[in-house]
Amino acid sequence: MSTPRTIPIRRLVLVALPLTIGSVVTAAALTESNRGVQDELPFPVADATEALMDTRLPMEVNDRVERWVRRFLGRDRVTFEEYLVREGLYGGMIRDRLRQRGMPEQLLYLAMIESGFSPTATSPMAASGVWQFMGPTARAYGLTVDSWVDERRDPVRATDAALDYLQELHGEFGSWYLAAAAYNAGAGRVKQALRRSGVDGGGDEQIYWQIIEHLPRETRSYVPKLLAAALLAEEPEHFGFEVERSLPYLFDQVLVPPSTPLRRVAEILEVSPSLMTELNPHLIRGQTPPDRSFMVRVPMGTSQAVVAALARNPRR
């Protein structure tokens, strides 16, 4: 491996232009301040370029993307490190599903900039979960959202719904950048921006940059933020990040009777109630719904113990 060397970010732009990556965010637009970040970035050019050449989304590193790179390396560095740690919980699962669909794997970082990979994240606009679905959109893509179960907070179910949505948007616009923008702002606003800018149709990633000034303010930062996150997260050690990613949750599922508290399952298994909550963040009242049995996630290899205990005493 070549020895990392420091190069100006402008040089990084030239090196990175042929690379590939992808898009999205739901947090409020943030100030693009870069105070305190030096112009020199540690970046092993040959190694990082080779590593990223196989990705599928076109990577454009321009001034807007550079600002987010500097921000993640500067004042938001600690937060970005936390995101990298939490990626270990769900990143493998999301990548597997992206591969199965033939979608760009870097769409994984949509979840990073949406929620920091937190299934309990909630926005001021009441979006929720790893993928920050609003309630109506979640229901439209098959997720249950009621007073007992909120599948926006289920990383597995919500990932399937989010990828369905992104595939639909990509089919409509022919561009992952525009699909990302539409995920953030809505397809209607992207269509409006296309009309106002006089651009005819989609199908080209460069169109996002052509219509960017006609998009809502938050959406103007959306794709640049994702591209910066993907660039750093794909090769974090090249940018000086030394993190140990969390281990993924390994679980079985077991059908549990109505109104069963998660704490009871925890007692049966002699595990902490917090572990059961972490495995089942979508059970928002800490128990199965009163009107139906429900599939509950339990630590891998423990499902038979739960089944046996509940069979002996289903109403304890």
Where are these regions (language model features)?
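Extracytoplasmic/secreted proteins, especially bacterial periplasmic and envelope-associated proteins
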Residues: 64-68, 82, 86-89, 93, ...
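An acidic, Gly/Ser/Thr/Pro-rich helix-cap/linker signature
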Residues: 2-3, 11, 17-102, 107
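Beta-strand-rich binding/interaction modules
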Residues: 262-287, 293-299
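Short, functionally critical alpha-helical segments immediately adjacent to catalytic or ligand/cofactor-binding
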Residues: 103-119, 179-186, 276-279
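Substrate-binding clefts and substrate-entry loops adjacent to catalytic sites
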Residues: 68-85, 117-124, 132-174, 199-214, ...
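Primarily a LysM-type cell-wall glycan-binding module
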Residues: 244-273
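Catalytic and substrate-binding regions of cell-wall glycan-acting enzymes that process beta-1,4-linked
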Residues: 34-73, 122-124, 132, 136-137, ...
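Extracytoplasmic
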Residues: 89, 93, 102-108, 112, ...
